[in-house]
C-alpha cells in the first residue's frame, strides 16, 4: 500500500510558524446585499480563516464603480481599495452569479481595474491562486459562466485552482439567517478555500527561499 503524502500535523504546525499567514481577498456578489454569490463568497473566506488565512471581502455596493477607463488617471476610493487589496493578496476567491450565461458587468468592470496593476512586479493576478465560485439557477448557466470566469483568470495570469464550486441557487442553499444548510455546498466551498490557501502557502514558501546568484 502506498504511503500517504499528506503532511503530518507537526509539519503543518512548523509550516505555519515559519511562514506568515496568507492574505486571501474575495470579490463578487451582486448589488443586492445577501445574494447567494455573496453568501457563498463569505462562507469560502470563513473556511480560509479556519485554515489560518487572513481575509478581506469586496462585494455588493463596494464593487459599484465608474466604468473602467484607462485614459482616466484619477480613481475613486472604492477602485483604489480594490486594486490595493489585490496587490497585497496572496490568493483570491471570485464568486459570481450567472447573468445571461456569463459573469455580470459589475464583476467584469471590477476585474478590468486590474489593468492598473499591469506594470507591477506581480502584474495582474500573477503568482496567485484564484478560486472560482459560480451561482446559477441552471446547469447550462453554471458551465458557461464558470468557463468564462476561469478564462478571465487565465488572461490575468492567475492560477485557477483545480477545483471550482458551482451552486444551484434555486435550491436555496442558504437559510434566512445567511447560514449554509446544504452540506454538499459547504464541502465544495471548503475545497476551494483549501486549495487557494494551500497554493498561497506554496507561493510564500517559494518567495522565502534563497535566490540563486550569478
Enumerate the predicted regions with their spans:
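N-terminal beta-loop-helix "entrance" segment that forms/cooperates
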Residues: 60-77, 173-177
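Glycine-rich phosphate/pyrophosphate-binding loop and the adjoining helix
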Residues: 2-25, 159-214
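A generic structural motif
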Residues: 51-56, 158
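N-terminal beta1-alpha1 ligand-phosphate binding loop
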Residues: 6-52
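Helix-loop-strand module that forms the ligand-binding subsite of alpha/beta enzymes
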Residues: 4, 77-156
Amino acid at each position: 500500500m502506498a504511503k500517504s503524502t499528506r503532511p503530518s500535523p507537526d509539519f503543518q504546525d512548523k509550516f505555519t510558524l515559519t511562514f506568515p499567514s496568507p492574505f486571501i481577498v474575495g470579490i463578487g456578489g451582486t448589488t443586492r446585499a445577501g445574494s447567494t454569490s455573496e453568501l457563498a463568497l463569505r462562507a469560502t473566506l470563513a473556511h480560509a480563516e479556519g485554515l489560518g488565512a487572513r481575509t478581506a471581502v469586496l462585494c455588493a455596493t463596494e464593487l459599484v464603480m465608474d466604468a473602467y477607463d484607462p485614459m482616466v488617471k484619477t480613481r475613486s476610493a472604492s477602485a483604489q481599495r480594490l486594486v490595493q487589496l489585490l496587490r497585497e493578496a496572496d490568493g483570491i476567491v471570485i464568486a459570481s452569479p450567472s447573468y445571461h450565461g456569463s459573469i455580470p458587468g459589475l464583476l467584469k468592470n471590477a476585474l478590468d481595474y486590474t489593468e492598473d496593476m499591469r506594470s507591477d512586479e506581480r502584474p495582474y493576478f500573477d503568482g496567485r491562486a484564484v478560486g472560482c465560485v459560480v451561482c446559477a439557477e441552471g446547469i447550462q448557466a453554471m458551465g458557461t459562466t464558470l468557463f468564462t470566469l476561469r478564462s478571465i483568470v487565465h488572461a490575468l495570469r492567475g492560477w485557477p485552482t483545480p477545483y471550482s464550486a458551482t451552486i444551484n441557487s434555486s435550491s436555496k442553499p442558504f437559510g434566512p439567517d445567511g447560514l449554509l444548510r446544504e452540506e454538499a455546498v459547504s464541502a465544495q466551498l471548503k475545497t476551494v478555500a483549501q486549495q487557494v490557501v494551500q497554493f498561497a502557502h506554496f507561493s510564500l514558501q517559494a518567495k522565502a527561499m534563497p535566490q540563486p546568484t550569478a
